[in-house]
Structures are given as structure tokens and as C-alpha cells.
Amino acid sequence: YQRGYRWTSIQVVQLLSDLLCYASSTFNKRIQGIKEGEYYCLQPVVARKITDKEVLKKILPKDAKKDAEAWEIIDGQQRLTTLYILYKYLITKCNISAESLKEDEIELYHLTYATRKGSSVFLANIGNNDDECNDNIDFFHMSQAYETIDKWIRSIDEYELAGAKSLCQRYNLSTKVSDILNIFRSLLNAEKDKYSMYGSVQVLWYELADDK
């Protein structure tokens, strides 16, 4: 079911803008005393659980827990990949280690493109492996998405007047890059039923039966 990663900067920026607008709107409601649970729902992801032990051995990391699970993504891989790249950007810029994520029980999921050997390694090190993207079209688009996220959040180059800072000014929020990073971190880490000043991002998850 998989195809290569093909999101352009336009699609990446649209997702970032939607998330920040939602977080800003929710924050302003919170400071007005409106505290009902809210969450931003991404378009559905359709998946099938992988139960073949031999396939799992090839997919899961060697240090994976015994009860670790893996899923074949039927629909939604572009969104999941972009969210993964965004999260990798955030933890890199905020100097958050893998050990800290495990301690906080918010360890990032892993992605492997069956059509691209080495995709999981490339994604795990994205931002530090630009030389590898020139010979692989999927890696090129992934690297471009990472670069777009960086420019948009920092509001530089083509996003100087139409990046995250301009949205924050519109909603009377801090335009410091560190504060914008924290908004996205809070948004992605928040759970649906727990209070958060910026709300929560959730994914509708549809599971297909093995025989479908």
C-alpha cells in the first residue's frame, strides 16, 4: 500500500499553520476561563496490525520491548511521516534526549518505508544527514519537509512575513522561537482527556481485520 513520501512545502506549511492556529485559539479560550476538553483531529489513519513474527523481527528495533507492536499503514502514511519529522525537529531543537522521552513515557514511534531500504535510519537521523538525500527521492522530500518546518517556525527566508511569528502576533502570543517550539511540544504531547493550555492533537485510527 505504501508509496514514497511526496508532501511538498505547501502541504507541510498548511499542517503547521492549522496546528498553530488551533493551539493559539485554544490558548485564548483558556485564559478566558473556557476549559472544556478540546482536541484537534487529524484526518483518519487506516492500519492493519502485523502479526507475522518473521516480519516483526525485520521491522522492530533490536532493543524493542517484548510487547512492542507494529502496524502496516494503509492510508495516512504521509501525515504520520510529517508529524514524525516535526517531532524529530522539536526534540532536536529543544535538546531532548531519547532517554528523557522514555522516562516521560512519550517515546517517539518508529517509521519504516517498505519500499525504501534504510528509511527508518534516515528518519531517525533527519537533520543530520543532508548528503544522503540527493540520491533518493523519498529522502529528498523528507529532508525538504524538515527544512520547511525549520524555516517556517523561525520565520526566515520565504516565510519571514508568513511564518509562525506572524501567526503568533495575530493571536497576541510570544514570537520567541523557543516559545513557539514549546507550543508545538505541548500540543503534540497533550493527551485527549487531560487539560492543556494549547489543546491536544489526536489521530482517528481505523484498524482493519487481518482478513480484509
Listing of model-derived features with the role each one plays in the protein:
Residues 1-212:
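Glycine- and hydrophobic-rich flexible loops that cap the catalytic core of alpha/beta enzyme folds
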